[in-house]
Amino acid sequence: MDRRTFFGAATIACLGSPFVVRAQKAKEARRIGMLSAGTLSTSEPGPFYEAMRELGWIEGENLIIERRGAAGKSEAVPALAAELVRVHPDLIWTDGAVAGIAAKNATTTIPIVAISGDPVRLGLVSSMSHPGGNITGWSTIAPELAVKRLEILRELIPSATRVGEIVDRANRYWYEVKKDYERAFASLKLQPHFVEITVADAIPGAITEIANGRADALIVRGDPMFGSNREQIARLALQHALPTIAEGRRMPEAGQLLSYGAVGGAAARRIASIVDRILRGAKPGDIPIEQPTEFELVINPKTAKALALTIPQSLQLRAEVLKG
Protein backbone atom coordinates (compact mmCIF):
# COMPACT_ATOMS: atom_id res chain seq x y z
CA MET A 1 0.00 0.00 0.00
CA ASP A 2 1.51 3.39 -1.01
CA ARG A 3 1.47 6.46 1.24
CA ARG A 4 -1.49 8.08 -0.57
CA THR A 5 -3.61 4.94 -0.25
CA PHE A 6 -2.62 4.48 3.39
CA PHE A 7 -3.42 8.04 4.46
CA GLY A 8 -6.64 8.02 2.45
CA ALA A 9 -7.78 4.82 4.15
CA ALA A 10 -6.69 6.12 7.54
CA THR A 11 -8.62 9.33 7.01
CA ILE A 12 -11.78 7.43 6.09
CA ALA A 13 -11.34 5.15 9.11
CA CYS A 14 -10.85 8.11 11.43
CA LEU A 15 -13.85 9.98 10.07
CA GLY A 16 -15.97 6.94 10.77
CA SER A 17 -14.70 6.45 14.31
CA PRO A 18 -16.98 7.31 17.25
CA PHE A 19 -14.33 9.68 18.60
CA VAL A 20 -14.42 11.84 15.48
CA VAL A 21 -18.22 11.70 15.29
CA ARG A 22 -18.40 12.98 18.86
CA ALA A 23 -15.85 15.68 18.06
CA GLN A 24 -17.89 16.78 15.05
CA LYS A 25 -21.04 16.95 17.16
CA ALA A 26 -19.23 18.99 19.80
CA LYS A 27 -17.97 21.34 17.08
CA GLU A 28 -21.48 21.80 15.70
CA ALA A 29 -23.04 22.30 19.14
CA ARG A 30 -24.16 25.74 20.26
CA ARG A 31 -23.22 26.98 23.69
CA ILE A 32 -25.51 28.93 26.01
CA GLY A 33 -24.73 30.34 29.43
CA MET A 34 -27.28 30.32 32.24
CA LEU A 35 -26.91 32.83 35.08
CA SER A 36 -28.90 33.14 38.29
CA ALA A 37 -28.58 34.52 41.80
CA GLY A 38 -30.21 31.27 42.89
CA THR A 39 -29.34 27.64 42.15
CA LEU A 40 -29.42 26.13 38.65
CA SER A 41 -30.18 22.42 38.75
CA THR A 42 -28.84 19.97 36.19
CA SER A 43 -31.07 17.15 37.43
CA GLU A 44 -34.41 18.92 37.09
CA PRO A 45 -35.55 18.77 33.42
CA GLY A 46 -38.19 21.48 33.65
CA PRO A 47 -40.48 22.87 30.96
CA PHE A 48 -37.79 25.12 29.44
CA TYR A 49 -35.54 22.16 28.60
CA GLU A 50 -38.52 20.19 27.31
CA ALA A 51 -39.48 23.11 25.06
CA MET A 52 -35.90 23.39 23.80
CA ARG A 53 -35.90 19.69 22.99
CA GLU A 54 -39.12 20.13 20.99
CA LEU A 55 -37.36 22.88 19.03
CA GLY A 56 -34.48 20.51 18.25
CA TRP A 57 -31.96 21.63 20.89
CA ILE A 58 -30.76 18.73 23.03
CA GLU A 59 -28.18 19.18 25.76
CA GLY A 60 -25.24 16.85 25.24
CA GLU A 61 -25.91 16.56 21.52
CA ASN A 62 -26.15 19.91 19.75
CA LEU A 63 -26.37 22.11 22.84
CA ILE A 64 -23.81 22.82 25.56
CA ILE A 65 -25.07 24.60 28.68
CA GLU A 66 -22.73 26.47 31.01
CA ARG A 67 -24.55 27.01 34.33
CA ARG A 68 -23.53 29.59 36.89
CA GLY A 69 -25.67 29.99 40.02
CA ALA A 70 -24.82 32.10 43.07
CA ALA A 71 -26.77 29.89 45.52
CA GLY A 72 -28.49 32.87 47.10
CA LYS A 73 -25.39 35.08 47.33
CA SER A 74 -26.37 37.91 45.00
CA GLU A 75 -23.09 39.77 45.45
CA ALA A 76 -21.32 36.88 43.65
CA VAL A 77 -23.36 37.24 40.45
CA PRO A 78 -21.20 39.89 38.65
CA ALA A 79 -18.12 37.65 38.91
CA LEU A 80 -20.13 34.70 37.58
CA ALA A 81 -21.33 36.83 34.66
CA ALA A 82 -17.73 37.74 33.80
CA GLU A 83 -16.80 34.06 34.04
CA LEU A 84 -19.55 33.15 31.57
CA VAL A 85 -18.43 35.81 29.10
CA ARG A 86 -14.93 34.29 29.12
CA VAL A 87 -16.25 30.96 27.77
CA HIS A 88 -17.70 32.80 24.74
CA PRO A 89 -21.25 31.42 24.70
CA ASP A 90 -23.56 32.05 21.75
CA LEU A 91 -26.14 33.42 24.19
CA ILE A 92 -26.61 34.11 27.90
CA TRP A 93 -29.94 33.32 29.60
CA THR A 94 -30.44 35.21 32.86
CA ASP A 95 -32.93 34.62 35.66
CA GLY A 96 -33.94 37.68 37.67
CA ALA A 97 -32.99 41.34 37.83
CA VAL A 98 -29.65 40.79 39.58
CA ALA A 99 -28.43 38.37 36.89
CA GLY A 100 -29.81 40.47 34.04
CA ILE A 101 -28.00 43.61 35.18
CA ALA A 102 -24.77 41.68 35.80
CA ALA A 103 -24.85 40.18 32.30
CA LYS A 104 -25.59 43.57 30.73
CA ASN A 105 -22.60 45.05 32.54
CA ALA A 106 -20.39 42.14 31.46
CA THR A 107 -21.01 42.22 27.70
CA THR A 108 -22.44 44.40 24.96
CA THR A 109 -21.96 41.84 22.19
CA ILE A 110 -23.15 38.43 23.41
CA PRO A 111 -26.96 38.10 23.03
CA ILE A 112 -28.80 38.06 26.37
CA VAL A 113 -32.26 36.61 27.03
CA ALA A 114 -33.26 38.19 30.34
CA ILE A 115 -36.11 37.01 32.53
CA SER A 116 -36.89 39.92 34.82
CA GLY A 117 -39.47 42.35 36.11
CA ASP A 118 -39.86 45.48 34.01
CA PRO A 119 -36.69 45.54 31.85
CA VAL A 120 -37.24 49.18 30.87
CA ARG A 121 -37.37 50.40 34.48
CA LEU A 122 -34.34 48.24 35.21
CA GLY A 123 -32.40 49.89 32.38
CA LEU A 124 -31.87 46.61 30.54
CA VAL A 125 -33.60 47.75 27.33
CA SER A 126 -34.83 51.00 25.82
CA SER A 127 -38.35 49.78 25.08
CA MET A 128 -40.49 46.65 25.28
CA SER A 129 -41.33 46.58 21.57
CA HIS A 130 -37.86 47.54 20.26
CA PRO A 131 -35.30 46.51 22.89
CA GLY A 132 -32.25 47.41 20.79
CA GLY A 133 -28.72 46.39 21.71
CA ASN A 134 -27.92 42.81 22.68
CA ILE A 135 -30.82 42.12 25.07
CA THR A 136 -34.36 40.78 24.77
CA GLY A 137 -36.36 38.40 26.91
CA TRP A 138 -39.39 37.83 29.07
CA SER A 139 -40.91 40.29 31.52
CA THR A 140 -42.62 38.72 34.51
CA ILE A 141 -44.26 42.02 35.30
CA ALA A 142 -48.00 42.29 34.87
CA PRO A 143 -49.22 45.35 36.80
CA GLU A 144 -52.25 43.64 38.20
CA LEU A 145 -50.40 40.61 39.62
CA ALA A 146 -49.19 42.11 42.91
CA VAL A 147 -52.67 43.48 43.64
CA LYS A 148 -54.24 40.19 42.54
CA ARG A 149 -52.20 38.19 45.06
CA LEU A 150 -53.24 40.55 47.83
CA GLU A 151 -56.87 40.27 46.74
CA ILE A 152 -56.59 36.48 46.93
CA LEU A 153 -55.07 36.83 50.40
CA ARG A 154 -57.96 39.06 51.47
CA GLU A 155 -60.43 36.50 50.12
CA LEU A 156 -58.62 33.68 51.92
CA ILE A 157 -58.16 35.52 55.24
CA PRO A 158 -60.70 38.37 55.45
CA SER A 159 -59.42 39.38 58.89
CA ALA A 160 -55.78 39.84 57.74
CA THR A 161 -54.25 43.22 58.57
CA ARG A 162 -50.47 42.71 58.44
CA VAL A 163 -48.50 40.89 55.75
CA GLY A 164 -44.80 40.03 55.66
CA GLU A 165 -42.55 39.97 52.62
CA ILE A 166 -38.84 39.13 52.32
CA VAL A 167 -36.84 41.22 49.85
CA ASP A 168 -33.46 40.53 48.24
CA ARG A 169 -31.66 43.84 48.80
CA ALA A 170 -29.51 43.26 45.69
CA ASN A 171 -32.62 43.24 43.49
CA ARG A 172 -32.66 46.78 42.16
CA TYR A 173 -36.09 46.23 40.64
CA TRP A 174 -37.59 46.04 44.13
CA TYR A 175 -36.68 49.66 44.78
CA GLU A 176 -38.19 50.65 41.42
CA VAL A 177 -41.58 49.18 42.34
CA LYS A 178 -41.65 49.55 46.13
CA LYS A 179 -44.05 52.51 46.05
CA ASP A 180 -46.36 50.58 43.70
CA TYR A 181 -46.39 47.71 46.20
CA GLU A 182 -47.10 50.04 49.10
CA ARG A 183 -50.07 51.52 47.21
CA ALA A 184 -51.35 48.00 46.52
CA PHE A 185 -51.21 47.13 50.23
CA ALA A 186 -52.89 50.40 51.20
CA SER A 187 -55.70 49.88 48.68
CA LEU A 188 -56.69 46.70 50.55
CA LYS A 189 -56.08 48.17 54.02
CA LEU A 190 -53.11 45.87 54.62
CA GLN A 191 -49.94 46.88 56.43
CA PRO A 192 -46.72 45.52 54.89
CA HIS A 193 -43.75 44.30 56.90
CA PHE A 194 -40.78 44.21 54.51
CA VAL A 195 -37.60 42.48 55.66
CA GLU A 196 -34.53 43.04 53.48
CA ILE A 197 -31.79 40.41 53.29
CA THR A 198 -28.61 39.96 51.25
CA VAL A 199 -28.00 36.19 51.44
CA ALA A 200 -30.18 33.08 51.50
CA ASP A 201 -28.77 32.14 54.92
CA ALA A 202 -30.78 35.05 56.33
CA ILE A 203 -34.14 33.59 55.24
CA PRO A 204 -34.87 31.73 58.53
CA GLY A 205 -34.22 34.85 60.61
CA ALA A 206 -36.37 36.96 58.28
CA ILE A 207 -39.32 34.58 58.59
CA THR A 208 -38.94 34.54 62.38
CA GLU A 209 -38.91 38.36 62.42
CA ILE A 210 -42.07 38.49 60.31
CA ALA A 211 -43.80 35.93 62.52
CA ASN A 212 -42.78 37.80 65.68
CA GLY A 213 -44.23 40.93 64.09
CA ARG A 214 -47.62 39.19 64.18
CA ALA A 215 -48.04 38.94 60.42
CA ASP A 216 -51.13 37.14 59.17
CA ALA A 217 -49.42 35.83 56.02
CA LEU A 218 -46.17 35.82 54.06
CA ILE A 219 -45.83 36.97 50.45
CA VAL A 220 -43.07 35.03 48.66
CA ARG A 221 -41.53 36.86 45.74
CA GLY A 222 -40.39 35.10 42.58
CA ASP A 223 -36.73 36.11 42.94
CA PRO A 224 -34.22 33.29 42.27
CA MET A 225 -33.04 33.42 45.90
CA PHE A 226 -36.51 32.46 47.10
CA GLY A 227 -37.26 30.00 44.32
CA SER A 228 -34.06 28.10 45.08
CA ASN A 229 -35.05 27.88 48.77
CA ARG A 230 -38.77 27.23 48.30
CA GLU A 231 -38.88 24.01 50.36
CA GLN A 232 -37.11 25.69 53.27
CA ILE A 233 -39.50 28.66 53.12
CA ALA A 234 -42.49 26.31 53.04
CA ARG A 235 -41.23 24.40 56.09
CA LEU A 236 -40.35 27.49 58.14
CA ALA A 237 -43.58 29.31 57.28
CA LEU A 238 -45.58 26.27 58.37
CA GLN A 239 -43.65 26.09 61.65
CA HIS A 240 -44.69 29.71 62.30
CA ALA A 241 -48.27 29.10 61.09
CA LEU A 242 -47.81 31.61 58.26
CA PRO A 243 -49.89 31.08 55.10
CA THR A 244 -47.72 31.70 52.03
CA ILE A 245 -48.91 33.49 48.88
CA ALA A 246 -46.35 33.02 46.11
CA GLU A 247 -45.67 33.86 42.47
CA GLY A 248 -45.25 30.53 40.64
CA ARG A 249 -46.68 27.02 40.86
CA ARG A 250 -43.41 25.42 41.92
CA MET A 251 -43.90 27.15 45.29
CA PRO A 252 -47.08 25.26 46.32
CA GLU A 253 -45.61 22.15 44.72
CA ALA A 254 -42.80 22.57 47.28
CA GLY A 255 -45.26 22.87 50.18
CA GLN A 256 -46.22 26.54 50.22
CA LEU A 257 -49.93 27.33 50.44
CA LEU A 258 -50.79 28.86 47.08
CA SER A 259 -49.50 30.78 44.10
CA TYR A 260 -50.85 33.09 41.45
CA GLY A 261 -48.78 33.88 38.40
CA ALA A 262 -48.00 33.13 34.79
CA VAL A 263 -48.64 29.60 33.55
CA GLY A 264 -45.17 28.09 33.85
CA GLY A 265 -45.28 25.82 30.82
CA ALA A 266 -46.52 28.60 28.53
CA ALA A 267 -43.80 30.97 29.74
CA ALA A 268 -41.10 28.33 29.26
CA ARG A 269 -42.21 27.70 25.68
CA ARG A 270 -42.10 31.40 24.82
CA ILE A 271 -38.66 31.84 26.40
CA ALA A 272 -37.36 28.77 24.56
CA SER A 273 -38.75 30.20 21.32
CA ILE A 274 -36.78 33.42 21.86
CA VAL A 275 -33.59 31.44 22.55
CA ASP A 276 -34.20 29.32 19.45
CA ARG A 277 -34.64 32.38 17.22
CA ILE A 278 -31.36 33.89 18.41
CA LEU A 279 -29.45 30.62 18.00
CA ARG A 280 -30.76 30.53 14.43
CA GLY A 281 -29.51 34.02 13.66
CA ALA A 282 -32.07 36.58 14.85
CA LYS A 283 -30.79 39.74 16.52
CA PRO A 284 -31.98 40.10 20.13
CA GLY A 285 -32.55 43.84 19.76
CA ASP A 286 -35.13 43.14 17.04
CA ILE A 287 -37.17 40.72 19.19
CA PRO A 288 -39.84 42.40 21.36
CA ILE A 289 -39.87 41.66 25.08
CA GLU A 290 -42.67 39.19 25.74
CA GLN A 291 -45.07 39.19 28.70
CA PRO A 292 -47.40 36.54 30.15
CA THR A 293 -50.98 36.35 28.91
CA GLU A 294 -52.05 33.18 30.75
CA PHE A 295 -52.27 32.99 34.54
CA GLU A 296 -53.04 30.27 37.07
CA LEU A 297 -54.00 29.93 40.72
CA VAL A 298 -52.53 26.82 42.38
CA ILE A 299 -53.41 25.61 45.89
CA ASN A 300 -51.74 22.99 48.09
CA PRO A 301 -54.62 21.43 50.13
CA LYS A 302 -52.25 19.53 52.43
CA THR A 303 -50.68 22.80 53.56
CA ALA A 304 -54.10 24.41 53.97
CA LYS A 305 -55.13 21.52 56.22
CA ALA A 306 -51.93 21.82 58.28
CA LEU A 307 -52.69 25.52 58.77
CA ALA A 308 -56.31 24.73 59.69
CA LEU A 309 -57.42 26.97 56.82
CA THR A 310 -60.62 26.42 54.88
CA ILE A 311 -60.17 27.40 51.25
CA PRO A 312 -63.27 29.37 50.14
CA GLN A 313 -65.32 27.75 47.41
CA SER A 314 -64.80 30.85 45.27
CA LEU A 315 -61.04 30.20 45.23
CA GLN A 316 -61.36 26.45 44.76
CA LEU A 317 -63.47 26.97 41.64
CA ARG A 318 -60.78 29.16 40.07
CA ALA A 319 -57.77 27.12 41.17
CA GLU A 320 -55.89 24.00 40.34
CA VAL A 321 -55.88 22.06 43.60
CA LEU A 322 -52.79 19.87 43.86
CA LYS A 323 -53.33 16.21 44.67
CA GLY A 324 -52.05 14.65 47.85
Feature names for model-found ranges:
Residues 1-324:
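Short hydrophobic alpha-helices and adjacent helix-cap/hinge residues
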